[in-house]
């Protein structure tokens, strides 16, 4: 016979961003707890609102499964003395298992007998296991936590109720000074405290108190209500997934409605309006069927439709205040002079150990000069890049960005266009922030891409130079994201810029305000981002490519893909093993690897030396790999007929030189001795 278990934790309002991860974590930890306790179940369903986290287990076994375990002990010759009595070794072994020597039996393994005991544990009733659920609740982790009312234990928010039901049976467990009961809280304004009758009546009991416990149901309610508004008014409403997820975690009983604002505010840039609505007020944006922004918005109330007109008016009033600010800053910022703002950046600190934002811009500008050549920009693009680099942070001192910091770069583009700058300069100012997340949008223009790389590189190198290096999960200056952005942009544009050579060039630049250091750490940091971009590529292949001598990002990613592609083919293992053997021996070469044909003693030496001399890796990675694998028979013949480590030192070094030249060329693809072929 199976049972159904419900656990609900009632809390003060949770931050919206914490709700979904905490709900998921509760479900996962409950499943792990039950499995660890040998309690089978059919399904687990989780619930969450801003004021509760809950989990229901259905089809839960009414008792633990019995456990039978065999334990191997000492050999019989050690377990028995000369008189046939059990020794202290045998007695200690069984005592440690909670058994006696009478439980011992002997079993033969490979011709020798050993002590064995069998321990049986009868499963307990589920009721005896339920109290352990408190440990599950205590084990939940949160990005932020607090303690209250003299409690030393920290939690995400103060706990108000705990409900643990096994079907209809109530458990009065203690958790953070709260005693469990079947009482739960309804909606803060529309509902009352209510008793949950059983584990299976949970949703309906709360629904009567205006709480929709299932987040999927709340989400569908919001979407359906928005679709109804769309159909009624003939508009298009942007249902942003992130905003939807945030809103559903702000409400327990959602009611969507449409509000409006004066059309005069549409003269303000659309990005300002959208930011005001979406980022600051958590409103959904409304457009006409052609995609044009309308003076309307969609909000979701935490409650029903009663007195909705008053709610709409209140939301409109709050939004208008934000739009008034936006309109004011838009008007006033146009009176500012870009060059004046750039000069004032001398007084804005980039970081106290690094200097001002203006100094950061100057260094970035010098880096763009270097990158422009490597990226083969045209004359016009180079001119636009220089101008963009000279002013690209100016909008940080505008009123609009001061009020809406999400618009940095975006407003820079708009203000530069109004000031008569070229579209390329304006676009680069917007694009230099890209990507803003791990999978974020990349710059579209070459000028913007180069400026983005330069800005990020100076940021990375500057922080490394003063010892502000990310450690563990701690990365307060988002240097990992910046590095990932550099790597992604280089790959997307297919620029064959070797990162090691680029970093060398940057270290050669002499900045008055800052001296770059920690080159090795920087290179390892960049390699770690390339490693991440390789995704699920096997670890040994990643290591082989990252250990190679070619540090062009696009080439490295292509090489890893090519190796994965052919790793299942028949000739992969023998070809890699041949090259790997060459790599291992080449490490023994001394000095400059020059080959003297006069020292050849067999045709196989000559054949390999000639093959290496004519080897020029070219074309896509798959073609280069074929070129290298084609050498496998020549390498094998060389090893079969040649004693590389000959007694004659000159001959030995000559043969090592052949292998050294081979591996130097092959290492431009990968270090093959890093690949596991076993």
UniProtKB/Swiss-Prot annotation:
Main location: cytoplasm
Single annotated GO MF: ATP binding
Organism: Streptococcus pneumoniae serotype 4 (strain ATCC BAA-334 / TIGR4)
Family affiliation: Belongs to the class-II aminoacyl-tRNA synthetase family.
Reactions accelerated catalytically: tRNA(Gly) + glycine + ATP = glycyl-tRNA(Gly) + AMP + diphosphate
Key words of the record: Aminoacyl-tRNA synthetase, ATP-binding, Cytoplasm, Ligase, Nucleotide-binding, Protein biosynthesis
SUPFAM superfamilies: HD-domain/PDEase-like
UniProt name for this protein: Glycine--tRNA ligase beta subunit
Location relative to the cell: Cytoplasm
Biological process according to GO: arginyl-tRNA aminoacylation; glycyl-tRNA aminoacylation
Superkingdom of source: Bacteria
């Amino acid at each position: 016979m199976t049972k159904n278990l419900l656990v609900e934790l009632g809390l003060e309002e949770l931050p919206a961003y914490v709700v979904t991860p905490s709900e998921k974590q509760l479900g996962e930890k409950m499943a792990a707890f039950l499995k660890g306790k040998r309690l089978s179940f059919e399904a687990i369903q989780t619930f969450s609102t801003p004021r509760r986290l809950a989990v229901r287990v259905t089809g839960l076994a009414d008792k633990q499964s019995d456990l039978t375990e065999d334990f191997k002990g000492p050999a019989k010759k050690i377990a028995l003395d000369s008189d046939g009595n059990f020794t202290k070794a045998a007695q200690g072994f069984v005592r440690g298992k909670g058994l006696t020597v009478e439980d011992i039996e002997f079993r033969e393994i490979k011709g020798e007998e050993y002590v064995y005991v069998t321990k049986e544990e009868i499963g307990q009733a589920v009721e005896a296991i339920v109290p352990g659920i408190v440990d599950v609740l205590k084990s939940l982790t949160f990005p932020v936590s607090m303690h209250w009312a003299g409690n030393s234990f920290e939690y995400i928010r103060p706990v108000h109720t705990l409900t643990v039901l096994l079907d209809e049976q109530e458990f009065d467990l203690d958790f953070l000074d709260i005693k469990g009961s079947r009482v739960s809280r309804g909606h803060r304004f529309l509902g009352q405290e209510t008793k949950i009758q059983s584990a299976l009546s949970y949703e309906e009991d709360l629904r009567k108190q205006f709480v929709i416990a299932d987040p999927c149901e709340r989400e569908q309610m919001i979407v359906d209500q928005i679709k109804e508004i769309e159909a009624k008014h003939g508009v298009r409403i942007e249902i942003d997934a992130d905003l939807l997820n945030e809103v559903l975690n702000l409400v327990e009983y959602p009611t969507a409605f449409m509000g409006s604002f004066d059309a005069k505010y549409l003269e303000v840039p659309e990005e300002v309006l959208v930011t005001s609505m979406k980022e600051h007020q958590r409103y959904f944006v409304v457009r006409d069927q052609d995609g044009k922004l309308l003076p309307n918005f969609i909000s979701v109330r935490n409650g029903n439709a009663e007195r909705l007109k008053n709610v709409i008016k209140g939301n409109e009033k709050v939004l208008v205040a934000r739009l008034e600010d936006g309109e004011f800053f838009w008007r006033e910022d146009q009176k500012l002079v870009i060059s004046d703002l750039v000069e004032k950046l001398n007084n804005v600190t980039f970081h106290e150990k690094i200097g001002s934002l203006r100094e950061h811009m100057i260094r970035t500008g010098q880096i763009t000069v270097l990158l422009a050549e490597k990226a083969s920009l045209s004359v016009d693009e180079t001119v636009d890049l220089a101008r963009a680099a000279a002013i690209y942070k100016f909008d940080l001192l505008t009123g609009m960005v001061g009020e809406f910091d999400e618009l940095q770069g975006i407003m820079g583009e708009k203000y530069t266009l109004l000031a008569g700058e070229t579209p390329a300069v304006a676009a680069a100012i917007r694009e230099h922030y890209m990507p803003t997340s791990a999978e974020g949008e990349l710059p579209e223009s070459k000028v913007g891409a180069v400026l983005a790389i330069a800005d990020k590189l100076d940021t990375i190198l500057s922080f490394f130079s003063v010892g502000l290096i990310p450690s563990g999960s701690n990365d307060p200056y988002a240097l990992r994201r910046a590095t990932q952005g550099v790597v992604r942009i280089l790959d997307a544009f297919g620029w064959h810029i070797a990162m090691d050579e680029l970093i060398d060039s940057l270290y050669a630049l002499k900045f008055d305000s800052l001296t770059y250091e920690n080159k090795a750490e920087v290179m390892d940091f960049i390699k770690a981002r390339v490693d991440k971009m390789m995704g699920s590529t096997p670890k040994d292949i990643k290591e082989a490519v990252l250990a190679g001598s070619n540090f062009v990002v696009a080439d490295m990613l292509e090489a890893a893909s090519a190796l994965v592609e052919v790793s299942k083919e028949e000739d992969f293992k023998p070809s890699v093993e041949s090259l790997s053997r060459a790599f291992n021996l080449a490490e023994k070469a001394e000095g400059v690897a020059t080959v003297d044909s006069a020292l050849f003693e067999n045709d196989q030496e000559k054949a390999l030396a000639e093959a290496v001399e004519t080897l020029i890796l070219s074309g896509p990675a798959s073609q280069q790999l074929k070129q290298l694998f084609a050498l496998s028979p020549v390498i094998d013949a060389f090893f079969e007929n040649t004693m590389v480590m000959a007694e004659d030192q000159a001959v030995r070094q000559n043969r090592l030189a052949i292998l050294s030249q081979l591996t130097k060329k092959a290492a431009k693809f990968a270090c093959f001795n890093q690949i596991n072929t076993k």
